[in-house]
Amino acid sequence: MGFAKKEHEFLSAIGLAPENPGGFINGKWKASGPVISTVSPSNNQEIAKVTEVSMEEYEEGLRSCNDAAKTWKSLPAPKRGEIVRQIGDALREKLQHLGKLVSLEMGKILAEGIGEVQEVIYMCDFAVGLSRQLNGSIIPSERPDHMMFEVWNPLGIVGVITAFNFPCAVLGWNACIALVCGNCVVWKGAPTTPLVTIAVTKLIAEVLEKNNLPAAIFTAFCGGAEIGEAIAKDTRIPLVSFTGSSKVGAKVQQIVTERFGKCLLELSGNNALIVMDDADVGLAVRSIFFAAVGTAGQRCTTCRRLYLHESIYQNVLDKLVGLYNQVKIGDPLEEGTLVGPVHTKASRENFEKGISTIKSQGGKILTGGSVIESDGNFVQPTIVEIASNASVVKEELFGPVLYVMKFKTLEEAIALNNSVPQGLSSSIFTSKPNTIFKWIGPHGSDCGIVNVNIPTNGAEIGGAFGGEKATGGGREAGSDSWKQYMRRSTCTINYGTELPLAQGINFG
């Protein structure tokens, strides 16, 4: 068991125990559902046990959260921002421990685990400033002695369903904004990263208690698909944010839309990186390496398709294969490791199935392509030479597999970038301004993230994060994403004594 190991003593410092109730409901930790073991992907050994919530406990949590919403929405936005600031400070105090937990339970390397928690802290900082800027527009009225303007008000409760690959960052993108906008939050974390869900919730709960606020402002559930389905169906939750596959996201959207709720979807990515003949090859190769190999290929923004101009194709490919052949794969908590395991045994099996499909469609494995025999879920980062019209290229294989293809012209490369159902992230490497502006313009990439001379992954929190097409169309984190977490009213006030009608209508 994880708690028996000296190197796992830090777990106690963030409120975890060998056995943990997985529901934070009206200020109490409770759960009476199935007991699961959460394991380390590095060796598949148990870290701790977690009891998932029952449907009765879900209902109790929603009732208390709904009651707490009345208090929270009445608090001025800057006061709500102060609470989020304190949450950020609480996370800062436990940054190293939480980052280590993310690495242990999810499998990403320690630097990325710490970076993920840091991203939540940055979101808290962003949200604090935002709490004083939830401004509506003043609109000129065509009628004399009339004033027209917009007012933004809280929705009430925001449901956040997160995925295993970013077990706390995606919560931060949503919850920090939702809270300052005056909403309570109901969080269902991924079933395979429950300890991250519990540890982060404990810190938030301490801040609420210290400020004498209702604990149910933030409600958390560890559970399976039935809890996610309940959130999607619940009319008390006006907005549901879901991160996961396009297949499941389509089902969530259908359920939420049928009850006229709002959906914020962050779904599959099948991200392309284009290297033009005028690109800085060294910069491109380093970027491709991080984009394709980082987090063992399990980021939504991982580079999965690489399009190389035919004149530099072999040069870039040789350099890239050289990097792949010397990458350190191993325990994500060990210094120097760049590639940890994929998250579960099922992920490893999907990798194997994916390689078989690739070979059946004429793909040539240039490096990697095998699982690594061990107690953990380790696979080899893989580069595949394949035809751009192979059907497997249109799909998202969630692992460190990179498809490499040639192109001749910019127009061809853009068409290839846009040829898949997904539309999350994209990047081009070039030194020509006219290429850059075509790429980011109306005839360029159709993705939500359109980069130049940087990887497809590693987005900053200041910009809105999200994609188009089968990626779902949602936007989280920065820019004006906050507007999705509030309801907008257009208000017109007549402060005169006459009743002029719009459009000059004379009615009697």
From Swiss-Prot:
PROSITE patterns to which the protein is assigned, alphabetical: ALDEHYDE_DEHYDR_GLU (PS00687)
Stretches that traverse the bilayer: none
Residues engaged in binding NAD(+): G244, S245, S246, K247, V248, G249
Example GO molecular function: aldehyde dehydrogenase (NAD+) activity
Reaction(s) this enzyme catalyzes, per UniProt: an aldehyde + NAD(+) + H2O = a carboxylate + NADH + 2 H(+)
GO annotation (BP), single: aldehyde metabolic process
Keywords: NAD, Oxidoreductase
Catalytic center residues: E266 (proton acceptor), C300 (nucleophile)
Family per record: Belongs to the aldehyde dehydrogenase family.
Assembly information from the UniProt record: Homotetramer.
Name of the molecule in the record: Aldehyde dehydrogenase family 7 member A1
Organism: Malus domestica
